[in-house]
């Protein structure tokens, strides 16, 4: 597996050529290989907003974690990575740089020079990949393949619904509510 950070929009500088990076990324996304994310809806929404298309299966480790342990209190990457990988996210360097620049390390990360974000982003990728190695074994051991595959197969439809919206028959919903209650 490979991890890397390819900055294109940092206000603090250190960006690579946006057009070349997006072309390269699209070449990877158009392959039929499995793409692994944590909280895939967030990343896939950004990818689609950039006008890029994703082929291949999309695996979400957040969904995998919920399927394998529905009673868990938290499904964030840091918590799950500590449990399954034995390490968490690499936030110290990012927080230090953000403090120096006087910005919020999460919501204003783009304002930092890319040099300060690369290690953080790469660690997220490493943690996600490691988490998937554990989750896929859990799914098999708990005989949850069918459930996880259903969730995974529905994901592209959920993304489309988020982007296109969903029509709701309000009158029909109100009638159904009266019937159910």
Question: Which role fits each region the language model picked out?
Answer:
Residues 2-140, 150, 158:
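Active-site-proximal helix-loop-helix substrate-binding element of RNase H-like nuclease domains
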Residues 146-181:
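Extended, well-ordered alpha-helical scaffold/bundle regions in very large, multi-domain proteins
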């Amino acid at each position: 597996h490979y991890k890397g950070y390819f900055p294109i929009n940092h206000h603090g500088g250190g960006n690579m050529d946006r057009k070349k990076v997006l072309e390269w990324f699209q070449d990877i996304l158009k392959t039929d290989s499995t793409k692994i994310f944590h909280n895939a809806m967030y990343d896939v929404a950004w990818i689609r907003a950039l006008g890029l298309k994703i082929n291949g299966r999309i695996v979400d480790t957040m969904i995998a974690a919920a399927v394998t342990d529905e009673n868990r209190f938290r499904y964030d990457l840091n918590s799950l990575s500590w449990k399954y990988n034995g390490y968490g996210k690499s936030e110290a360097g990012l927080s230090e740089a953000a403090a120096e620049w006087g910005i919020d390390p999460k919501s204003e990360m783009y304002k930092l020079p890319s040099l300060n974000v690369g290690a953080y982003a790469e660690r997220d990728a490493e943690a996600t990949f490691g988490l998937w190695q554990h989750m896929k074994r859990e799914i098999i051991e708990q005989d949850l393949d069918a459930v996880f595959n259903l969730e995974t197969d529905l994901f592209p439809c959920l993304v489309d619904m988020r982007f296109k919206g969903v029509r709701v028959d309000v009158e029909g919903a109100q009638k159904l509510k009266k019937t159910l209650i």
